[in-house]
C-alpha cells in the first residue's frame, strides 16, 4: 500500500479535524484541551503517546515500524492567535478573541492524517516515526523549550514539517533547498527626553518628536546600509508616549522587528540600527536605548532532504503538484530544529478564492481550502518512510 491510495479515504477525516481545531483554538502555552484531544486520538490508533505533563501542553507520538532502524520526526505546531475571528462559517472560533489565524489547525489535521496512514502501513516503516505536536510556535520559544521534553529530539536523526501557505494555490507543495523563511528578532527602543508644558515646548525635549525622527531615519538602515542584493525588513509596529493632551511627554517606547536571511550580517544590522537610534536622539538633546531580542534563526532546508522531498511529492502527487516558491520574510521556530538535525520545511498551498481562502495569515478572515490537506498527509507519511528506507 502507498499513501497516495489513502488520500481520498482520509480526505474527510483530515478536513473534519482541521475544522474541529479551528472551532476550539487555544493560545500559546495554553493548549491544554488541544493536547488532550490529540493524545486521545493518537492512542485510539495504537500510537505510543508521551504528553509533556510538566507543562500540560504538547506531546510526542511514536509509531514503531515493522523493522528496526533510525528515527525521523514529523512536526506540527498547535497554538492559535489572539485574534477576533470575522469569518461566518459554521466552524468559526467558539472562543472570543482567539482564532487559528495562521493555519496551525491545518498542521495538526495533516499530522493526524499522516499518523492514520502510517499506522496502516507499518510493514513499510523501517525504524521509528516520531509525531511532534509542538506548542507555542507563535512565541518563537516553543521549539527550543519543546526540544528538551523527554529527550525526544536527541533520539531522532532527521525531521520534516511544513506550513500551509496562502500565497500558494491549493494543492501545490514547495520544498526547495536553502533559506525558506527569515530570521526574526524583536527590537525595543526607549527614548528619554524632558517632560514639559504643551505651551512651552522650548523648555522640554519632546519624546514624540524624537521617536518620530528615529522611525524616519531607521528607513535609511535598509536603503543605505544594506546591500541591495541582501534582504532586510525593519518594521516599527508600535509607539507609546504621553497620556495628556497638553503635556509634552518626556519618554517614549517603540517596538518593532527585523527579518533577514544572512546570520553573518546580523551584527552589522544591529549596530546600524543602534547608531541611528542613539545619534538621532542626541541630535535632539535626548537619549535612546536599543534593546535587541533574538527570536528565531532563518529556516534553511538541507539540500539532500529537499531533494528527497521533491521525489516524494512527485511520486505521491505527481510532478504537476511540485511548485517553486520564493523564500519569505516571516519567521518560523522550526528553524531551531534545522540548526541541529537535517530536514526539510515545506510550503503547502491552500489558496482558493472559491472558498474564500485569499486572506493573509494572521488576518481575522483567514481560512484555507482544507480539501487538499490529506494530500499533504500523504507526503508527510511517504517522506518518513522514504527517509528511513534510505538511511538504514
Give the location of each predicted region.
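Hydrophobic beta-strand positions in extracellular immunoglobulin-like domains
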Residues: 63, 191-193, 258
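Histidine/acidic-residue-rich, glycine-tolerant segments that coordinate divalent metal ions
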Residues: 59, 81-83, 87-99, 105-106, ...
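Hydrophobic face of alpha-helices
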Residues: 14, 32-39, 111, 208, ...
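Acidic/His- and Gly-rich active-site-bordering loop/insert found
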Residues: 1-100, 109-125
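Metal-dependent amide/peptide-bond hydrolase catalytic core
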Residues: 212-392
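A structural signal for isolated positions on well-ordered beta-strands in alpha/beta enzyme cores
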Residues: 50, 130-132, 289
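Divalent metal-coordination and catalytic microenvironments
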Residues: 21, 61, 74, 104, ...
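Non-cysteine beta-strand/loop elements that form the S-adenosyl-L-methionine
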Residues: 73-75, 187, 345-350
